[in-house]
Amino acid sequence: MAKDPSFDIVSEVDMQVIDDCVNVAVKEIDNRFDFKGQNIQIELNKGEKTITILAPADFVLNQVRDILFQKFIKRGLNQKCLREKKKEKAAGDAIREINEIVHGIDKDLAKQIVKDIKDMKLKVQASIQDEQIRVSGAKKDDLQAVITMIKGKDYPIPLQFTNYR
């Protein structure tokens, strides 16, 4: 007999898509008339999984972040995949914002998701496996109900479903 149907809940981001979004945003910022002559930088560090934005003022920083988020939306990325790590003063009056790219589900959120699944009182098992959650059950309908519930809730990171078996 075959194993019970299952799927994994993960939070993954394609770094190549983020790299493309950053490059397109940098090109748009370089071509915008209202940003001419200003020291604005967006840097992607793939090793540390961070995006650093440098802007001369807080207002400009917000505009640059909005441009970056527009590029994320066009490419189908959720803006929840960026978490502000720290905002600091840079040289002169400039402001530097370091954003962390969320990758994987942390333990506290994983426990909350498993609790939410168990509160549904369906015959499914949810187990935390490193930075993902495996959900298995006898009926595919129960698994689909779990997916619907998770999509309906607003978690602080984007979640995807993989490894349907």
UniProtKB/Swiss-Prot annotation:
<comment type="function">
    <text>Nucleotide-binding protein.</text>
</comment>
<dbReference type="InterPro" id="IPR007551">
    <property type="entry name" value="DUF520"/>
</dbReference>
<keyword id="KW-0547">Nucleotide-binding</keyword>
<dbReference type="InterPro" id="IPR035570">
    <property type="entry name" value="UPF0234_N"/>
</dbReference>
<dbReference type="GO" id="GO:0005829">
    <property type="term" value="C:cytosol"/>
</dbReference>
<comment type="similarity">
    <text>Belongs to the YajQ family.</text>
</comment>
<dbReference type="InterPro" id="IPR035571">
    <property type="entry name" value="UPF0234-like_C"/>
</dbReference>
<protein>
    <recommendedName>
        <fullName>Nucleotide-binding protein BHWA1_00627</fullName>
    </recommendedName>
</protein>
<dbReference type="GO" id="GO:0000166">
    <property type="term" value="F:nucleotide binding"/>
</dbReference>
<dbReference type="Pfam" id="PF04461">
    <property type="entry name" value="DUF520"/>
</dbReference>
<dbReference type="InterPro" id="IPR036183">
    <property type="entry name" value="YajQ-like_sf"/>
</dbReference>
